[in-house]
Amino acid sequence: MAGNPANTESHDDDALHRRGLMFILSSPSGAGKTTIARKLLSEDSEIAMSVSVTTRPMRPGEVDGKDYFFVEPAEFERMVEANEFYEWATVFGNCYGTPKAHIRERLKTGGDVLFDIDWQGTQQLYQKAQADVVRVFILPPSLDELRRRLTGRGTDSAEVIAARMDRAQAEISHWDGYDYVVVNDDVDGCFGKVREILAAERMRRTRQTGLIDFVRGLMRG
């Protein structure tokens, strides 16, 4: 027996609904995390960079709500006391925090949020939002290649590069705290793998918020 076209269309619409995810990219400096993040933001309209709340004064050219959410110290303190941050920290006298409400609203409407953070920030987010978090760690093909990339920037002294290399090895030691590990020996190849991870995670059954009703509709005939 033929089904009702109107019902079929409704079920298709339901199946398209999904909950967004918090997509974390981490890597030691020079491994390509920032390049991959920029490519992802420029080529995928469903994901946006996480916007932090800060007490830092707004700089020329910055836009409130785009670069940061700028607040007074008293408001930031209130948000901390109200548990409105996934994580927060004080850096050089200014406070920075990841706001729960803004991110949860985006996830609810099916939008994804990109985080360019280190292993410590990743751990904090995962502890508070495990079901929504996808963790990807990007590795260099070798330490020699990482050193070559850092030196090739031409912006750091030998002492700074040495410090970055030491820090890189410390960060790499936390690779097993991630869901996926990708070796960046080629930017395009690495980017392709990261996009495949994102696409697969978007299709997880637990994120398909309209799937239950869709399947029930199919079973009713």
From Swiss-Prot:
Cellular component GO terms held in the UniProt record: cytosol
EC number assigned by the record: 2.7.4.8
CDD domains: GMPK
Guanylate kinase-like domain: residues covered: 20-199
Subcellular location: Cytoplasm
Domain of life: Bacteria
Coiled coil regions, renumbered to chain: none
Enzyme class per UniProt: transferase
GO MF term set: ATP binding; guanylate kinase activity
Pfam families attached to this UniProt entry: Guanylate_kin
Catalytic activity: GMP + ATP = GDP + ADP
Alphabetical keyword list: ATP-binding, Cytoplasm, Kinase, Nucleotide-binding, Transferase
Residue sites binding ATP per the record: S27, P28, S29, G30, A31, G32, K33, T34
Presence of the UniProt keyword Iron in the record: no
PROSITE patterns given in the database record: GUANYLATE_KINASE_1 (PS00856), GUANYLATE_KINASE_2 (PS50052)
Principal place of residence: cytoplasm
Function noted in UniProt: Essential for recycling GMP and indirectly, cGMP.
Entry similarity comment: Belongs to the guanylate kinase family.
PANTHER family xrefs: GUANYLATE KINASE (PTHR23117:SF13), GUANYLATE KINASE-RELATED (PTHR23117)
The protein's name in its UniProt record: Guanylate kinase
Species whose genome carries this gene: Novosphingobium aromaticivorans (strain ATCC 700278 / DSM 12444 / CCUG 56034 / CIP 105152 / NBRC 16084 / F199)
